[in-house]
Structures are given as structure tokens and as C-alpha cells.
């Protein structure tokens, strides 16, 4: 007798989405989560007398997904706030800044002030990139199969296909340099694309990162009211409203497999939960290498391939804290009188290194060292959402830093690196910003490993090109099914990848439901 029809392991937003769709379809589902609450890296937590987002607070791609309506998330409390400008793109040398708006015309108007020589280049870029971005979004929404790809392409009258295929083979730098003369125009796109993925922008296969600006013009970025965690909170309510079950503080030890079929999930405390279908919404490397004692014959080649892959290491950290006054960036004097109509304190500030310093940062990462000009994404969540103010009424900040390798030379325990990042961030501001910080904390890769059960602090990502995806390479990641009957993979490590997107969870649920219907 099974305990449920399906078990979803991992309560991050993709696991929650998958579970919610299954429960909505009438599938008896148990969600298993190692932590004492769901949400994963999309969580908002209480600490230091304030609420902090675990990772980025800006949500974009998920707002293009039908799941918000299909799971009735607005009814369950999800409400997005939109900053007047999405990003301020800044640089360590404190010049060349520019402002990015969701509206393309506003962005172009701003560039005519800050980078007039790049205006025509940006228009030419959008003319080419918008159709590619539209196609990429449709593929992500519909799933990775050749018939669905052709259907999406037909709906667009085949517009953008040739560039999508060409860009998917190229590097991000190659594509960007086809349009922009000034690296200040393209480095912010690299900072939120290949750098976040941990890949050099010169690497072949990173070219679709160049759609980043076009995508943000198509889909408005927003922040959930009361923090990023309002998203998983709403999904959880949707899931529970349809009879879903949750087991918290339940750490998975291994999967039980019999006759090439998944049979049960064995927990560290010795409890066993049985179900004919198991969806692992977590690091696929950990699932396939550490949770399966003896690979059944049909899965031996798959398991062997994953065993040969090194266990990936995390490279991102985040500082959170409370500040007495809003920061005054040095770029504000550069933009003074030109963008007074925009409340720039609401925007995320991307502080990018030069191309040369980024190359150096990649080399240092491999040596367990950290650049003196790291990529930084800074935000003041309370400037847009008063409900994110600290209990004492002061503002809160978040600062993401890349690269900060898990295998840091000297280790993280006694490291002074987080203090150094605050100093580097402060160099981008007027006055003594460091003295304005009353409390702060550091989420480094070792902390992500300890508190969020992320092996080596690593957040997985999906890196295959669209072409490789469409022809079905690494089918366990692109099609979500493994050779072990009843075992599926989902989450950030599966198509179409990481970030607050929700497409992996949605598409996996569709795949599982189709398999259940056909069984």
C-alpha cells in the first residue's frame, strides 16, 4: 500500500509548483522538504530584526508563465510591485552608468543622455533580439520538444529562428559585440547572465544570454510584496488547498528502487515514504550519484556519466543588513538632473567589472581567490516595499557577490572577505556608507550548504544550448524523465534553467501527469 501517488522532494519554488499542479489534477501528493519551511532560495526569512530575501528579489520570467493564473496565486496572496526603473547599470570605476527601464523607449531616451553613440546600436539590437527572446520564452513555456518548438516558430512565422540557432552556438561576447561598441553597454547583461551561471562570457553556447535586455523589455520585473518568499508562500497555499501534504525537516537519505522502478524515499531518520512516482526537485548530481545505491541496468550508463562529473561548487554569496540612510551612489551625481523623474533607489544596482577584470575573476575563482572588483547586485528592498523595512523602521539592503568560491583559500569560517565586500560596495558611494550599517549578516557558500542543504553551496543550473535540448541530449534534464521508471527530475538544474522562472516545475508536472494518464 503506497503512502501517496507521488512524492516531490524539495520545497523550492519549482518543487512547489510541480506538487501544486499534481495536487490540482487530483494526484495524491506528498512534498518532502529538508528545512523547517518551504521556499528554498526563493524564501524570505526573519533575522536581525528584519526580513531578508535569500537570493535575488527581482522576479521576471515567472511573470510570463501561466502558472500564476492556473494556480490562482493572486488569490493566495501574491502581489507584485514594480520599480520605476528595473536596473541602474554601474561600474567599479564609477563612470559610464546607465538606466534600464522595462519600457524600451524610456531606456533609449536615457541612453540618448548617457551613451548617445550607442542609441542606434541599441535599436538595431532590439530589432534582432526581440524575436529571438519571444521564441525562447515560448519554448520555455511549452517544453523542450521538436514539435512544440516548430509550433512556437510557426506562430512567429519562423521569425528569429536563424538567429536563435546561431546565437545558441556563439558566445555572449560575440553576440553583444555585433551590436555594441562600448563594453559598458553589454557587461551588465553578462553580469546577470554568464556570470550568474559561472561561465566565462567567451564560452561557446552562452550567446542566448544576449537576449537579456530584450527579455526584460518583454516581461516587466517585479518584487513580491513582503519579499520574494511571498511567491512560495502562495504556491504552498494553492497546493494545500487541493489536498497536498507536506513533511518538513525530512532529509532524504536514498531512493529505494526495485525491478527498475522507484519504490520509496528513505529518510535519514529511518522513515520510509512509498509512492510509484518520485520527482526530485533538487541537485540532479546529488540525486543520481548519492541517492541510488545500485543502479538498475537501464540506468547504468546514465549513473556512470554523472559519476564521472565532478561535484560542482558554489560561487555566490549574499550580504543582508539594516542601514540608517539610503545609499548615495557616486553615479547619482553623474545622472543628476537627467533622471530626476525616476526614483532610482527602488532599482537594483548592477556593479559590473570591466571585461579584463572579469577574466581575472574567473582565473582567481579556480584558485580559491576573490577579485578586488567582483560582480555585485545591490538592492534596497524597503525603498520599494515599506513592508520590508526592519522592525525599528530602518531600511534593509541585499548585496549579491560573485565569484566567492566554496573552496576559498583559507576557508570561510574566519574569513574577512564579507567585510571587504562592504568596503568595495562603499567605494561606489559618497560618504562613509559603512558607518551607516547597523547590523548585517553573510550568506556564503558554506552557509548555503549548511542551512539550505545545497551540496558545496552550489545552486544547479541548466547549461545545454536550445539545439542540444531540442534533439534530446541529457534527456533526464531536458525531458525530466530518467530510465528508472517513476523517477523524474526537476528544478533549476533542468530545462530551461535557474532563476525565479517556474518553467521546470510546470513542465515536469505536465510530463508526470501525461505518464500517469498513459499508465
Indicate residue ranges for each PLM-predicted region.
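A glycine-rich dinucleotide-binding beta-alpha-beta segment and adjacent secondary-structure elements
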Residues: 182, 186-197, 214, 370-381, ...
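Active-site-proximal substrate-binding core of FAD-dependent oxidoreductases
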Residues: 257, 515-519
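A conserved beta-strand/loop element that lines the FAD pocket in flavoprotein oxidoreductases
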Residues: 239-252
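N-terminal glycine-rich phosphate/pyrophosphate-binding loop and immediately adjacent elements
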Residues: 2-138
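Mid-domain catalytic core of redox enzymes
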Residues: 253-390
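A conserved FAD-binding loop/helix module that cradles the flavin
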Residues: 56, 492-513
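Flavin-binding catalytic cores
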Residues: 327, 363-371, 412-450
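Active-site/ligand-binding neighborhood in enzyme catalytic cores
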Residues: 130-242, 455-468
Amino acid at each position: 500500500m503506497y503512502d501517496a501517488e507521488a512524492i516531490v522532494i524539495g520545497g523550492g519554488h519549482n518543487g512547489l509548483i510541480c506538487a501544486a499542479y499534481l495536487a490540482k489534477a487530483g494526484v495524491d501528493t506528498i512534498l518532502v522538504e529538508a528545512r523547517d519551511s518551504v521556499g528554498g532560495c526563493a524564501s524570505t526569512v526573519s533575522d536581525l530584526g528584519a526580513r531578508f530575501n535569500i537570493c535575488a528579489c527581482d522576479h521576471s520570467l515567472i511573470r510570463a508563465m501561466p502558472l500564476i493564473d492556473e494556480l490562482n496565486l493572486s488569490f493566495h496572496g501574491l502581489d507584485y510591485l514594480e520599480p520605476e526603473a528595473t536596473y541602474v547599470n554601474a561600474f567599479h570605476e564609477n563612470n559610464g552608468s546607465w538606466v534600464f527601464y522595462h519600457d524600451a523607449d524610456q531606456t533609449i531616451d536615457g541612453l540618448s543622455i548617457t551613451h548617445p553613440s550607442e542609441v542606434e546600436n541599441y535599436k538595431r539590437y532590439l530589432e534582432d533580439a526581440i524575436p529571438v527572446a519571444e521564441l525562447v520564452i515560448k519554448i520555455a513555456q511549452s517544453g523542450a520538444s521538436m514539435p512544440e518548438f516548430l509550433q512556437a516558430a510557426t506562430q512567429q512565422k519562423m521569425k528569429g529562428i536563424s538567429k536563435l540557432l546561431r546565437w545558441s552556438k556563439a558566445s555572449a561576447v560575440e553576440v553583444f559585440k555585433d551590436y555594441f561598441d562600448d563594453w559598458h553597454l553589454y557587461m551588465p547583461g553578462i553580469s546577470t547572465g554568464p556570470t550568474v551561471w559561472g561561465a566565462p562570457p567567451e564560452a561557446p553556447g552562452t550567446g542566448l544570454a544576449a537576449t537579456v535586455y530584450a527579455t526584460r523589455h518583454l516581461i516587466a520585473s517585479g518584487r513580491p510584496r513582503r519579499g520574494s518568499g511571498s511567491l512560495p508562500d502562495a504556491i504552498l497555499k494553492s497546493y494545500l488547498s487541493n489536498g497536498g501534504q507536506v513533511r518538513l525537516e525530512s532529509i532524504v537519505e536514498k531512493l529505494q528502487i526495485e525491478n527498475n522502478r522507484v519504490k520509496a524515499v528513505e529518510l535519514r531518520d529511518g522513515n520510509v515514504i512509498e509512492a510509484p512516482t518520485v520527482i526530485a526537485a533538487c541537485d540532479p548530481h546529488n540525486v543520481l550519484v548519492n541517492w541510488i545505491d545500485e543502479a538498475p541496468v537501464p540506468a547504468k550508463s546514465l549513473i556512470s556519466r554523472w559519476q564521472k562529473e565532478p561535484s560542482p561548487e558554489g560561487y555566490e554569496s549574499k550580504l543582508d543588513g539594516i542601514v540608517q540612510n539610503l545609499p548615495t551612489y557616486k553615479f547619482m551625481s553623474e545622472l543628476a538632473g537627467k533622471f530626476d523623474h525616476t526614483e532610482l533607489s527602488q532599482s537594483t544596482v548592477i556593479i559590473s567589472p570591466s571585461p579584463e577584470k572579469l577574466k581575472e575573476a574567473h582565473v582567481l575563482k579556480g584558485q580559491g581567490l576573490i577579485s578586488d572588483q567582483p560582480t555585485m547586485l545591490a538592492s534596497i528592498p524597503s525603498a520599494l516595499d515599506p513592508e520590508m523595512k526592519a522592525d525599528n523602521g530602518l531600511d534593509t539592503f541585499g548585496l549579491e557577490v560573485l565569484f566567492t568560491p566554496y573552496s576559498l583559500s583559507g576557508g570561510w569560517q574566519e574569513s574577512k572577505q564579507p567585510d571587504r565586500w562592504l568596503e568595495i560596495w562603499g567605494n561606489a558611494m559618497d560618504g562613509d556608507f559603512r558607518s551607516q550599517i547597523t547590523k548585517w549578516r553573510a550568506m556564503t557558500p558554506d552557509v548555503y550548504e549548511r542551512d539550505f542543504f545545497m551540496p558545496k553551496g552550489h545552486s544547479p543550473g541548466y547549461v545545454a544550448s536550445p539545439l542540444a535540448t531540442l534533439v534530446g541530449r541529457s534527456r533526464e534534464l531536458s525531458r525530466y524523465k530518467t530510465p528508472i521508471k517513476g523517477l523524474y527530475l526537476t528544478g533549476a538544474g533542468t530545462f530551461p534553467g535557474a532563476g525565479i522562472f517556474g518553467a521546470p516545475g510546470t513542465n515536469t508536472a505536465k510530463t508526470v501527469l501525461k505518464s500517469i494518464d498513459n499508465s
